[in-house]
Regions:
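Bacterial N-terminal signal peptides that target proteins for export
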Residues: 2-12
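Hydrophobic alpha-helical membrane-embedded or membrane-associated segments
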Residues: 10, 14-21
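C-terminal region of N-terminal signal peptides and the immediate post-cleavage residues
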Residues: 19-35
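Functionally critical loop-and-helix segments that line ligand-binding/catalytic clefts
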Residues: 32-48, 53, 179-244
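Substrate-binding cleft of extracellular glycoside hydrolase catalytic domains
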Residues: 32-57, 61, 65-159
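Positions that flank functional sites
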Residues: 70, 100, 168-169, 220
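Catalytic domains of cell-wall/extracellular-matrix polysaccharide-remodeling enzymes
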Residues: 125-203
Length: 244
C-alpha cells in the first residue's frame, strides 16, 4: 500500500472509532448498563452554610443555585454560594422558582427579576425555569406563561433556558405539551425521585429526552447539613449546557 493509501486507511479507522464511541453510550443505556454521568446538586437558602470544597471532594461537578422566586424574592445565599462553588471548581447555574399569576406582565416581570439576580456569565450553566406550581392558571394560560417567561429570558440573555419540572405536573398542568421543546427549549431537567430511570413527559420531550435528572430530594452530601437534592447530567460533557 502506498503512503496515500495508508493515510486513507488510517482516516477510515479513526472515523470508525469515533462512530463507535458515539453509539456506545445510547446502546449501553438501552441494555441497562451504566453510562458515565456528571453528578451534581441543587441548593437554596434552605441548605444553610455550605462547605463547597467538601462538596467538590464528594465528587459533585455542578450545582444549580436558586436565584429568585416570583416577582419579589431573591435568594440571599445565591451570590455567596455561587462565588464559593466556583472557587471550589464546580460549574454553577441559576434557577428561578416560578409563581405564575397572570400571563403577559407577570411572566415578563418574573423573567426580568431572574436575569437581574442571576447575573450569568460565560461558562455558567444556562438559565433554568423551575415550573412546578400553576398558580391557579388553566392549561392554555400556563403554557402561555411558560413560553412568555422563556422568550423574555432569551430576549434578555440570548440563552435558551433549561426547563425543570416533574412528569406529573407537566402532564396535568401543562397538558403534556410538546410545544415548548418544539420552540427550541430542548433541554429538560426532570424531577423523578426513587426511580431507576426518569419518566420523560411530552413525547420524550419531543424526542430530545432528558438532559438533567433530579433523582432524589433527600440526598446527603459531605459539606451540607441535612437533606439536599441530588442531580445527574446525562453526560460527563457539560459543554452543550453552558453559556458561551
Amino acid at each position: 500500500m502506498n503512503r496515500a493509501g495508508r493515510w486513507f486507511a488510517r482516516i477510515l479507522i479513526l472515523l470508525a472509532i469515533v462512530a463507535l464511541t458515539m453509539a456506545a453510550a445510547p446502546l449501553a443505556e438501552a441494555r441497562g448498563k451504566k453510562v458515565p454521568r456528571s453528578e451534581g446538586i441543587d441548593v437554596s437558602h434552605w441548605q444553610g452554610t455550605i462547605d463547597w470544597p467538601r462538596v467538590a471532594g464528594a465528587g459533585k461537578k455542578f450545582v444549580f443555585l436558586k436565584a429568585s422566586e416570583g416577582r419579589n424574592y431573591t435568594d440571599p445565599t445565591y451570590a455567596g454560594n455561587r462565588q464559593a462553588a466556583k472557587a471550589a471548581g464546580l460549574r454553577t447555574g441559576a434557577y428561578h422558582f416560578a409563581r405564575p399569576e397572570t400571563v403577559a406582565g407577570d411572566a415578563v416581570g418574573e423573567a426580568q427579576v431572574f436575569v437581574a439576580a442571576a447575573k450569568l456569565q460565560s461558562g455558567d450553566l444556562r438559565p433554568v425555569l423551575d415550573i412546578e406550581v400553576n398558580g391557579g392558571l388553566g392549561v392554555a394560560a400556563l403554557q402561555a406563561w411558560v413560553r412568555t417567561w422563556l422568550d423574555e429570558v432569551y430576549r434578555l440573555t440570548g440563552q435558551r433556558a433549561i426547563v425543570y419540572t416533574s412528569p406529573n405536573f407537566w402532564r396535568t398542568s401543562m397538558g403534556d405539551t410538546q410545544s415548548i421543546a418544539q420552540a427550541g427549549y430542548t433541554t429538560l431537567w426532570i424531577a423523578h425521585w426513587g426511580a431507576s430511570s426518569p419518566t420523560v413527559p411530552a413525547g420524550n420531550w419531543a424526542g430530545y429526552g432528558w438532559s438533567f435528572w433530579q433523582y432524589s430530594s433527600t440526598g446527603r452530601v459531605s459539606g451540607i447539613s441535612g437533606d439536599v437534592d441530588l442531580d445527574r447530567a446525562r453526560t460527563t460533557d457539560l459543554a452543550p449546557y453552558l453559556v458561551p
